[in-house]
């Protein structure tokens, strides 16, 4: 029987032999290669499918021991810890220097096109198939494409590798010589030892080099005054240098922290029942906080983080330099939020202040398994408490719950705190930042997905051509009536059937260009440059945050031009998310004066003069504000009030607070605002004489800030003591417990103990949540009055909350507290257990009142929504606000108008599901005459028009949940499809994602979701395109999105300009790419007619190799990057041009087939024109050689073919300027240059000096010109006819722009605007009302409206100009004038007539 030592030794050697084998098993499993049963079992054991495996244990809750030995249940048979924890060394790079080449090549050849071309290279290396071609030369195109991609991947990965190295070698403080029982004995393989030696030598070498550089810098020192203002960006070399210098500095100091680092430590207090220090244990004195690298930190280690240092791993806070155990962190690296957040140390660790106390700690932590939720952590810290009772020493286990409030996550930065001592619970890939760093859902653009169909079609054509060649060639060899039977040495294969097979594969090699090898890399290059253009668009740069529109996914820019549905959050997306407390209701009395944007919108709909009404309201509010401030100053001197920042205006409130309306109302006002000053989680920060509140929610900051302004000031919080000053009187409340807010609970509660020793629970939340928790049969009239006030507030566009309280006895509290502590200490399902316990105490509440907060619209939102609607895009708003609030915001932002028929889908919970389905069916039939059948849904998929009616649907979240979960999805979707606007209110993040998924999958349309908060991430990732706004709630949405912008108004240009351009560019580019491949390949096919279809080359092989790679790629790439039919201004002024993208007219398959047929026709001309002309003429060079040799014929055919292809591409471009024409000329010249230079080489054999012979003959130039004209004239004639008699919308707009008619329209509009009365302001496209200004904002230039019914170009404002078009739009205006080319103006748009789009007729 093996000893424990032998087993331990065997286990240490185990990784050395199994590591490689397991990697092979994993690779085979990913490739779906069947594994043997033994291999499958071994893989599952070490990969975690088996719960008892090393990695499987990692997925279970973990228990970590500190100063205590591991129990037997945590040990294996060798005495080692069962658990395996990942190293803290992380790697975000895809490759290492060793595996880059094989891994990158393996990933690239997962692309089917690359595999196909690799197959061709292998075929050509076999002499029977590729005897005419050098295999090395045949591999050049594939090597170039793979090489370019590899270089691009290497550049991208190099940066990640450098950042990984820098991060892993960041120094931190770890308790050295501490016996950590949680870590298994680590086996270091020979390879890792080798790497460590190499790294050590590398560091020594760099250190010596740095010493030389430092000495040289000292010798060549520059005076300080000469260096003033000089600043350089850090390089990777400087990053390494700083890392190695830091290492040397702390190694020179033996890694010990100087005593000065412990200045300001917390005073050691007397031991209490919950204390993790064993004061009877003796410290060895060998443990010190020694500097080490992040990569060496392990689970179970004590670490010490200093001020402004980054957190190396996920750690539980044991103590901090603050006497109350408070520390502050910045979480910008995790969620993008820059405001500081407060964290609290465990109360049981308040005496842990130095190395000795850490060494004497005796406790264990029960932790949940690692997961990616950044906002949740459940754990418990437990230890033994010894007590002497009845003369015997007994031990009792005590516990303290651990939540996220006591955690520091890797990536956060410690701020405003001298030091923090903590213990590591998660390292490396188990940390939350790494679990959240996984790649977002892979999104491929629609054109890219549809590209497979084009490729498959070309494969079918390719194999058909090869099959024809194989059959005909086999038949030809079988017959004896041809001269080849007598002059050839026999068939290659030995029989007609084998000859056919050989010819088939030789044909695959010959016609390979039909599947363009450079297509995918060209598309990737084009989309990368398009993303760069988007990023550098100054019109989408948000100056306030210094943030440009940032593409995160570079491969879906063309999808932006096909969006049909936009799903938008409201708060922070349409609004500013800057909350202003405007009104409140207290004890049935409403307070506050305000004139909101929604109120202005209602006045406008009622036909009132909003300008005059605004002046009246503002004048009244200003007088009331001055009166209120004067009354408050007389009541008490509030030094924290800044007069200009006061948003809650109500002199009546101060009057009632002073008791002039009775003692009852005065007490109610006092309790209401004192509750606001206590029920929160904000941090008070003193800035001079002012107090500024930092909160995770802008609503909470507004509530506490208004309480401060009216005299109820929250001063500070130390541990569990909240200090307030109410009307000048300082009070201290003990915070007993906080029940946090969550999106599921929709409420928050605190329990405080007042100066009079009374226990009070204060609860704030949504009105529907609070009202159902009030004391039954109490405050009946107050409930009705408050509900009416809240309804009015919501109609005014304000966000509402309710405040309530409950007084508790000490017995009630501690009875509940016992249950709450059990729930709070639970490792699993803690949230659900806390919710159950919270329901016990958050009941029988007494209503105090309600608040109303205004969230103003962002600048430009109404204009942007109007533009998107005119473009044919449907906008749905998904918000968590009340229905009334959402409706009024909808009116304010032009989503709704007074003429709409509102369908409010809000029913009681008592209504059963069958009854709800009847109601939904009634709505659908009554308004639209539909039954909700599957056939109607299929018809709806093909209908992309804007709903013709004037209906708007508003649905509540509770009803929406039942609709989405039941069989009513089809009826609901049809109802929404027929409505011009849809508002979903009171919805959860999951419901937002479900709505997006329903529309996207059921209607098969392009969807875009836009939001600004973490609750929008699910919706953003579910949509085809996700757009995140960098806002007040952090950058969680922006980090998860495909595009990040600063304001909603930038969305209109992103979609209507860049999206439309990129869609047109990519669609046209793909069609032209396949067109040129067809032209080139079929010229080779026609040659086979005169060659027994034996798959011989017409061209020199270099032509075949370079055609798609060099000769014809540049014009197509320029088209994909640079082309635009109209400029950005016209794209925004005439948003109806966007509808072609929604209908996918430019990427329709019939358009693709048209290009293929055009290429087929041109291939006939290119080959037969040259062949038939030359075949009937005998020509000879000066040396007497007949120039009709096959290589010379190849030049005769290749030259016009390449010229035709390049000219055809630029003819399809809409925008001609010096740049595009220059690149077109460069592409053409490469052919002439290559032919002239390459044919001078002796190694070209029969091709030797072909250029010098052929280019001297006039026949060649006659054939060249004739072929180009014959190929392109039908296309030019078709384009001219289409634009003259069946012009598209864009053709009319471009012609109007060219003939200055749009400029004349602008001038007439300006004249009419000056003469126009204010009545026109009722237009839905007017500039949004700004209540803060003294008058209505000046209207901007109106977008043009293209009326396709009357087929005239009209403006949205009254005018007398209506252009009429003669049969010749371009009469008297040359198409290709030098002036236009020099200015880079736009050429008339090319296109083809589509039956799906009704062309505009004169």
Curated annotation (Swiss-Prot):
Quote the EC number: 7.6.2.1
Q: How does it sit in the membrane?
A: Multi-pass membrane protein
- Organism, by scientific name, is Schizosaccharomyces pombe (strain 972 / ATCC 24843) (Fission yeast)
UniProt KW keywords: ATP-binding, Cell membrane, Endoplasmic reticulum, Lipid transport, Magnesium, Membrane, Metal-binding, Nucleotide-binding, Phosphoprotein, Translocase, Transmembrane, Transmembrane helix, Transport
Quick check: keyword Chaperone in the entry? no
Catalytic residues per the record? 569
Job of this protein: Catalytic component of a P4-ATPase flippase complex which catalyzes the hydrolysis of ATP coupled to the transport of glucosylceramide, phosphatidylcholine, phosphatidylethanolamine, and small amounts of phosphatidylserine from the lumenal to the cytosolic leaflet of the cell membrane and ensures the maintenance of asymmetric distribution of phospholipids.
Q: Where is this site: Involved in the release of the transported lipid into the cytosolic leaflet?
A: 517
| Primary enzyme class | translocase
Q: Name the encoding gene, please.
A: dnf2
**Name of the protein in question:** Phospholipid-transporting ATPase dnf2
């Amino acid at each position: 029987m093996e000893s424990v030592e032998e087993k331990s030794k065997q286990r240490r050697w185990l990784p050395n032999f199994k590591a490689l084998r397991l990697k092979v098993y994993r690779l085979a499993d990913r490739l779906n290669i069947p594994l043997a049963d033994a291999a499958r079992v071994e893989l599952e054991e070490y990969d975690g499918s088996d719960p008892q495996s090393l990695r499987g244990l990692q997925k279970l809750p973990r228990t970590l021991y500190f100063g205590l030995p591991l129990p037997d249940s945590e040990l294996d048979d060798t005495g080692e810890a069962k658990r395996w924890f990942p190293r803290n060394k992380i790697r975000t790079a895809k490759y290492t220097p060793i595996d880059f080449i094989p891994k990158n090549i393996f990933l690239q050849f997962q692309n089917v096109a690359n595999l196909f071309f690799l197959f061709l290279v292998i075929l050509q290396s076999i002499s029977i198939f590729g005897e005419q071609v050098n295999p090395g030369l045949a591999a050049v195109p594939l090597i170039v494409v793979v090489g370019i991609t590899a270089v691009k991947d290497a550049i991208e990965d190099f940066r990640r590798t450098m950042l990984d190295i820098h991060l892993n070698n960041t120094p931190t403080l770890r308790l050295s010589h501490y016996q950590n029982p949680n870590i298994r004995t680590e086996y270091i393989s020979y390879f890792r030892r080798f790497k460590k030696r190499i790294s050590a030598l590398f560091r020594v070498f760099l250190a010596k080099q740095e010493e030389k550089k430092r000495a040289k810098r000292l010798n060549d020192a520059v005076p300080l005054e000469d260096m003033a203002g000089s600043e350089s960006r850090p390089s990777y070399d400087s990053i390494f240098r700083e890392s190695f210098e830091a290492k040397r500095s702390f190694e020179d100091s033996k890694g010990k922290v100087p005593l000065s680092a412990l200045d300001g430590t917390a005073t050691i207090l007397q031991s209490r029942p919950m204390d993790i220090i064993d004061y009877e244990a003796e410290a060895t004195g060998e443990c010190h906080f020694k500097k080490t690298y992040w990569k060496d930190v392990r689970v179970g280690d004590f670490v010490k983080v200093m001020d402004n240092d980054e957190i190396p791993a996920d750690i539980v806070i044991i103590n901090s330099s603050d006497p109350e155990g408070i520390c502050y962190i910045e979480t910008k690296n995790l969620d993008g939020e820059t405001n500081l957040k407060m964290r609290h140390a465990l109360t049981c660790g308040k005496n842990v202040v130095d190395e000795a106390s850490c060494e004497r700690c005796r406790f264990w932590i029960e932790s949940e398994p690692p997961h990616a939720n950044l906002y949740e952590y459940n754990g418990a810290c437990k230890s033994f408490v010894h007590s002497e009772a009845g003369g015997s020493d007994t031990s009792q286990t005590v516990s303290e719950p651990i939540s996220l409030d006591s955690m520091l996550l890797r990536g956060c930065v410690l701020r405003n705190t001298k030091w923090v001592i903590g213990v590591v619970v998660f390292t490396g890939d188990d940390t939350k930042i790494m679990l959240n760093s996984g790649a977002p859902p892979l999104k491929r653009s629609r054109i890219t997905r549809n590209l497979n169909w084009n490729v498959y079609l070309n494969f079918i054509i390719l194999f058909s051509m090869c099959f024809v060649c194989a059959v005909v060639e086999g038949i030809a060899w079988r017959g004896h009536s041809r001269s080849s039977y007598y002059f050839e040495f026999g068939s290659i294969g030995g029989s007609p059937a084998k000859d056919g097979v050989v010819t088939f594969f030789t044909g695959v090699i010959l016609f390979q260009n039909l599947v363009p090898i450079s297509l995918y890399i060209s598309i990737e290059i084009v989309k990368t440059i398009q993303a760069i253009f988007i990023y550098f668009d100054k019109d989408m740069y948000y100056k306030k945050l210094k943030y440009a529109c940032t593409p995160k996914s570079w491969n879906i820019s063309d999808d932006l031009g096909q969006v049909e549905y936009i799903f938008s959050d409201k708060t922070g997306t349409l609004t500013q998310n800057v909350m202003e407390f405007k009104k409140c209701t207290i004890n049935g009395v409403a307070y506050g004066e305000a004139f909101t944007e929604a109120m202005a919108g209602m006045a406008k709909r009622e036909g009132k003069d909003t300008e005059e009404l605004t002046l009246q309201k503002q004048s009244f509010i200003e007088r009331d504000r001055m009166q209120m401030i004067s009354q408050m100053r007389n009541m008490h001197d509030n030094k924290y009030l800044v007069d200009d920042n006061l948003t809650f205006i109500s002199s009546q409130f101060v009057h009632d607070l002073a008791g002039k309306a009775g003692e009852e109302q005065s007490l109610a006002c006092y309790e209401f605002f004192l509750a606001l000053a206590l029920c929160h989680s904000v941090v008070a920060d003193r800035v001079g004489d002012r107090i500024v509140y930092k909160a995770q929610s802008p609503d909470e900051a507004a509530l506490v800030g208004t309480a401060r302004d009216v005299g109820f000031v929250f001063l500070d919080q130390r541990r569990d003591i909240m200090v307030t000053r109410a009307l000048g009187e300082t009070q201290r409340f003990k915070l007993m417990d906080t029940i946090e807010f969550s999106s599921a609970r929709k409420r928050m509660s605190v329990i405080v103990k007042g100066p009079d020793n009374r226990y009070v629970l204060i609860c704030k939340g949504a009105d529907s949540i609070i009202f159902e928790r009030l004391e039954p049969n109490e405050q009946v009239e107050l409930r009705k009055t408050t509900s009416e006030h809240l309804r009015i507030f919501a109609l005014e566009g304000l966000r509402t909350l309710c405040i309530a309280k409950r007084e508790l006895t000490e017995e009630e509290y501690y009875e509940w507290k016992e249950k709450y502590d059990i729930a709070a200490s639970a490792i699993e399902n803690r949230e659900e257990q806390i919710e159950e316990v919270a329901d016990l105490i958050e009941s029988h509440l007494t209503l105090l009142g309600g608040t109303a907060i205004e969230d103003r619209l962002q600048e430009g939102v109404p204009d942007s929504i109007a533009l998107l609607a005119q473009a044919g895009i449907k906008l749905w708003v998904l918000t968590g606000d009340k229905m009334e609030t959402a409706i009024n915001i909808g009116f304010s932002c032009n989503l709704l108008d007074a003429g709409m028929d509102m369908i409010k889908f809000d029913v009681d919970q008592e209504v059963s599901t069958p009854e709800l389905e009847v109601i939904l069916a009634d709505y659908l039939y009554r308004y639209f005459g539909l039954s909700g059948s599957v056939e109607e849904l299929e018809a709806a998929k093909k209908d992309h028009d804007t709903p013709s009616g004037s209906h708007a649907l508003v649905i509540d979240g509770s009803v929406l949940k039942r609709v989405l979960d039941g069989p009513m999805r089809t009826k609901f979707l049809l109802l929404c499809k027929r409505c011009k606007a849809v508002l979903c209110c009171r919805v959860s993040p999951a419901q937002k994602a479900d709505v997006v998924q329903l529309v996207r999958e059921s209607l098969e349309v392009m969807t875009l979701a836009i939001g600004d908060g973490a609750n929008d991430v699910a919706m953003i990732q579910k949509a085809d395109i996700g757009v995140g706004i960098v806002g007040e709630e952090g950058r969680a949405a922006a980090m998860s999105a495909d595009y990040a912008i600063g304001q909603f108004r930038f969305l209109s240009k992103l979609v209507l300009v860049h999206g439309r351009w990129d869609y047109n560019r990519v669609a046209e580019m793909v069609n032209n790419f396949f067109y040129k491949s067809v032209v080139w390949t079929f010229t080779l096919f026609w040659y086979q007619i005169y060659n027994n279809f034996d798959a011989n080359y017409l061209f020199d092989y270099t032509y075949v190799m370079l055609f798609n790679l060099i000769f014809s790629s540049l014009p197509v790439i320029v088209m994909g990057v640079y082309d635009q039919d109209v400029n950005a201004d016209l794209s925004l002024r005439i948003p109806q041009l966007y509808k072609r993208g929604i209908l996918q007219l430019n990427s329709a398959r019939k358009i693709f087939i048209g290009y293929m047929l055009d290429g087929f026709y041109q291939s006939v001309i290119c080959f037969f024109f040259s062949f038939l002309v030359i075949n009937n003429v005998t020509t000879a060079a000066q040396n007497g050689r007949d120039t009709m040799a096959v290589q010379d014929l190849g030049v005769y055919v290749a030259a016009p073919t390449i010229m035709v292809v390049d000219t055809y591409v630029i003819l399809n471009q809409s925008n001609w300027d010096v740049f595009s024409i220059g690149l077109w000329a460069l592409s053409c010249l490469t052919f002439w240059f290559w032919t002239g230079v390459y044919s001078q080489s002796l190694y070209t054999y029969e091709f030797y000096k072909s250029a010098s012979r052929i280019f001297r003959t006039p026949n060649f130039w006659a054939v060249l010109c004739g072929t180009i004209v014959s190929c392109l004239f039908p296309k030019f004639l078709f384009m001219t006819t289409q634009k003259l008699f069946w012009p598209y919308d864009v053709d009319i707009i471009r012609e109007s722009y060219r003939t200055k008619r749009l400029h004349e329209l602008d001038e007439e509009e300006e004249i009419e605007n000056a003469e126009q009365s204010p009545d026109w302001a009722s237009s839905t496209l007017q500039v949004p009302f700004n209540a803060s200004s003294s008058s209505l904002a000046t209207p901007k230039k109106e977008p043009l409206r293209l009326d396709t019914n009357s087929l005239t170009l009209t403006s949205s404002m009254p005018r007398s100009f209506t252009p009429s078009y003669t049969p010749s739009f371009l009469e008297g205006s040359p198409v290709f004038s030098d002036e236009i080319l020099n200015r880079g103006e736009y050429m008339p748009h090319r296109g083809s007539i589509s039956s799906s789009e009704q062309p505009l007729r004169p």
